[in-house]
Amino acid sequence: MRLTPHEQERLLLSYAAEVARRRQARGLRLNHPEAVALITDHVLEGARDGRTVAELMASGCEVLGRDDVMEGVPEMIADVQVEATFPDGTKLVTVHHPIR
């Protein structure tokens, strides 16, 4: 299987999000990279499903709450920016203050 660097990055991100989901299911609080991976994966998969940029910007804030992450993580993540592929092209989705 031959993947472009972009495809490799997406695959790594998807796997990181899956690891984060497993840890979250075990009751563990997520660290910074895990939280970012989970939010990013939510946006990428939502774009693939045909959701709009506005929908993803709003729903990206509902993926994780303060109780889901380690102390200090919400303050470390001011924005998550994801370049996602939509049916009508690639767009930048910014989720402001994703952990509330």
From Swiss-Prot:
Q: Which GO terms describe its cellular component?
A: cytoplasm
Question: Which top-level group of life is the source organism from?
Answer: Bacteria
Catalytic reactions of this protein: urea + 2 H2O + H(+) = hydrogencarbonate + 2 NH4(+)
Q: GO biological process: what's one of them?
A: urea catabolic process
Q: Does the keyword Hydrolase apply?
A: yes
E.C. designation(s) = 3.5.1.5
Q: What are this entry's molecular-function GO terms? A: nickel cation binding; urease activity
Q: Which Pfam families has this protein been placed in?
A: Urease_gamma (PF00547)
Q: What PANTHER family does its record include?
A: UREASE (PTHR33569:SF1)
Q: Which family does it belong to?
A: Belongs to the urease gamma subunit family.
Question: What's the protein name?
Answer: Urease subunit gamma
Q: Can you name the source organism?
A: Mycobacterium ulcerans (strain Agy99)
